[in-house]
Amino acid sequence: MTGDPIDRVRNREVWAAVNADVTDPGAAGLWEQSEVSWGLFRIPEATLGLLGDVRGLTVAELGCGTAYLSAWLARAGARPVAVDLSHHQLASAARCQDQYDLHFPLIEADAAVVPLRRAAFDLVISVYGAAPWCEPSAWVAEAARLLRPGGRLIFLTNSVLAALCVPEDEGYATDQLQRPQRSLSPVTWPGGGTEHHPGHGEWIRTLVGAGLVVDALHELHPPAGAATHADYEIVTAEWAEQWPAEDLWVAHKPA
């Protein structure tokens, strides 16, 4: 997570509370999904076509939460390892593994210091896990270390614009900037954790500095008829129709 030990403890506490209120009650529903969907507005993988054929691929999911994405990858024939700092979320993941009789390794670890072998993975993936919650240069360097030559990194996080427009205390993103961009990495929310939302240029420098090649940046908008997410007060569907709510990055490690 973030490089500050105090922030790491605070973030772990935040996710203990979020897990109790949101991710644990919702875990089973996500484990039962028949297809990967991306982001707050559940954009189907079939629409974006990012993953391709994952059969036989070794996958490290960093900041896995309840590991529903790893579960889908396992059903599709991949060999995932799911990593998270929150033992509460991993306990929810373990319960779902037993419930659905689908098991793969669950590891409690910081995404910036993963106890896994160098160059062991074809794909490193993170959906609202490492990207907003860890210091960017630390976790991206670790992702690059884990990847085999030719392996891919895919990660999803809040858009920079959404992070700029979310009110200080509570409420959905507005149509006005609420803070300077230089204050976004790190940014500590009142009553919440510490996140990182660097600008696109900084993300590119971080990825290239770790030895990766940037392949794509998808700025996500909701599909037609999408509803505002019931649990996460970040952006409304109406806001996201006008401005990108999420950034989905794709990079690879040169062969």
Spans of features found by a protein language model:
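Conserved class I S-adenosyl-L-methionine
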Residues: 152-185
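A short acidic, Gly/Pro-enriched loop at the edge of an enzyme's catalytic core
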Residues: 112-123
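N-terminal, positively charged/glycine-rich alpha-helical extensions of SAM-dependent methyltransferases
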Residues: 1-32
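A short glycine-rich, Lys/Arg-flanked "PGG" loop and its adjoining helix->strand segment in the class I
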Residues: 137-152
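A short SAM/SAH-binding and catalytic strip from SAM-dependent methyltransferases
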Residues: 123-137
